[in-house]
């Protein structure tokens, strides 16, 4: 590592990814068990399961990536491991971004009240569109990540062969052009679902806030559980949106190669990218009693085991 601070940030990122693994694993376990018991696979469960699975594998991949950087840094950057890891990282990030957007759209369509004909039509047919959401997300994520592998592999091969004086500048210019194209392609892969999520979240917050104000005007002075639930929903959506935007900005900075590899600035972005998916999984858990109950049981069991060994 280039500095002690970068090493410290890498350790923090690994810890955050482990927390994310625990959170997303909890969500997948609870949702899958619920579907098996009820023998009903709801639209919400499908979206949440695929979102949590994508983030589970993303953070597992990030942990492996961080460990290789920490212990095998020279071979990691000199060989094709870097290309493979970054390509899979882009695919999993794009996939999780898409399903986070679909979850926000689902909340918006199901919870918010609209008068527009398209949104009313979408509200009635959201369940039948779930398979198309899965296919679209998979194809789009694959399409935006695969060219990076091809071009990066070719660029790596070109740089390992001798360059003559007549064509060296041409190759470097071509590589820079290809790199710019890849950066734009990767950014589009996460920008489109981000626009969907921001737009649907704003609509949802606006609808919930309007409904909250109406209930406050009709309140009798006693604590209304429905009103508290609405305020909690607004906080949940806003927290989810804030984490998503923060993750988007940090990821764009990493993919755009804005900072020198292993610099202090990039290390901070890595910590943010590892923290935001874990934070979003915690937001989902604490907003859902089913998820919260299982996580509390797991933490209680772990705490009991630690106390038993220490005593």
UniProtKB/Swiss-Prot annotation:
Membrane association type: Multi-pass membrane protein
Subcellular localization: Cell membrane
GO cellular component, one term: plasma membrane
Annotated GO MF terms: bitter taste receptor activity; G protein-coupled receptor activity
Keyword line: Cell membrane, G-protein coupled receptor, Membrane, Receptor, Sensory transduction, Taste, Transducer, Transmembrane, Transmembrane helix
SUPFAM superfamilies with a match to the protein in the record: Family A G protein-coupled receptor-like (SSF81321)
Reported effect, residue 89 to A: Strong increase in quinine-binding, loss of diphenhydramine- and coumarin-binding, small decrease in diphenidol-binding, strong decrease in chlorpheniramine-, chloramphenicol- and chloroquine-binding
Gene Ontology biological-process entries: calcium ion import into cytosol; cellular response to chloramphenicol; cellular response to chloroquine; cellular response to diphenidol; cellular response to nicotine; cellular response to toxic substance; cellular response to xenobiotic stimulus; detection of chemical stimulus involved in sensory perception of bitter taste
InterPro entries: TAS2R
Membrane topology (Cytoplasmic): 31-55, 109-128, 200-235, 288-311
Transmembrane regions listed in the UniProt entry: 10-30, 56-76, 88-108, 129-149, 179-199, 236-256, 267-287
Topological domain ranges for the Extracellular compartment: 1-9, 77-87, 150-178, 257-266
Main location, first listed in the record: membrane
Tissue expression: Expressed in the oral cavity, as well as in the gastrointestinal tract, including in the upper palate, tongue, proventriculus, ventriculus, duodenum, jejunum, ileum, cecum and colon.
Family note: Belongs to the G-protein coupled receptor T2R family.
Function according to Swiss-Prot or TrEMBL: Bitter taste receptor. Binds quinine, dextromethorphan, diphenhydramine, diphenidol, chlorpheniramine, diphenidol, chloramphenicol, chloroquine and coumarin, this latter being a weak agonist, as well as epiquinidine, ethylhydrocupreine and quinidine.
Name the record gives this protein: Taste receptor type 2 member 40
UniProt organism field: Gallus gallus
């Amino acid at each position: 590592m280039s500095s002690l601070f970068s090493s410290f940030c890498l350790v923090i990122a690994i810890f955050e990814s482990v927390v994310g693994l625990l959170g997303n694993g909890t969500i997948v376990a609870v949702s899958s068990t619920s579907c098996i018991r009820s023998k009903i696979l709801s639209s919400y469960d499908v979206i949440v399961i695929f979102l949590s699975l994508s983030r589970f594998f993303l953070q597992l991949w990030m942990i492996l990536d961080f460990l290789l950087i920490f212990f095998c840094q020279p071979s990691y950057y000199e060989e094709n491991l870097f290309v493979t890891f970054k390509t899979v990282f882009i695919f999993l990030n794009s996939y999780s971004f898409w399903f986070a957007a679909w979850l926000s759209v689902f909340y918006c369509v199901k919870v918010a009240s609209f008068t527009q004909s398209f949104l009313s039509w979408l509200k009635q047919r959201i369940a039948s569109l779930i398979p198309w959401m899965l296919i679209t997300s998979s194809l789009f994520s694959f399409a935006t990540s695969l060219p990076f592998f091809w071009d990066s592999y070719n660029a790596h091969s070109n740089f390992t062969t001798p360059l003559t004086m007549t064509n060296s500048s041409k190759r470097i210019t071509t590589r820079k052009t290809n790199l710019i194209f890849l950066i734009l392609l990767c950014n589009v892969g996460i920008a489109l679902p981000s626009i969907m999520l921001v737009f649907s979240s704003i609509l949802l917050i606006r609808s919930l806030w309007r409904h909250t104000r109406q209930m406050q005007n009709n309140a009798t002075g006693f604590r209304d559980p429905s009103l508290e639930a609405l305020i909690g929903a607004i906080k949940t959506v806003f927290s989810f949106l804030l984490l998503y935007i923060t993750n988007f900005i940090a990821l764009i900075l990493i993919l755009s190669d804005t900072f020198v590899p292993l610099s202090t600035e990039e290390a901070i972005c890595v910590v943010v990218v590892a923290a935001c998916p874990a934070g979003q999984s915690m937001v989902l858990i604490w907003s859902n009693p089913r998820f919260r109950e299982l996580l509390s049981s797991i933490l209680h069991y772990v705490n009991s085991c630690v106390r038993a060994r220490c005593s």
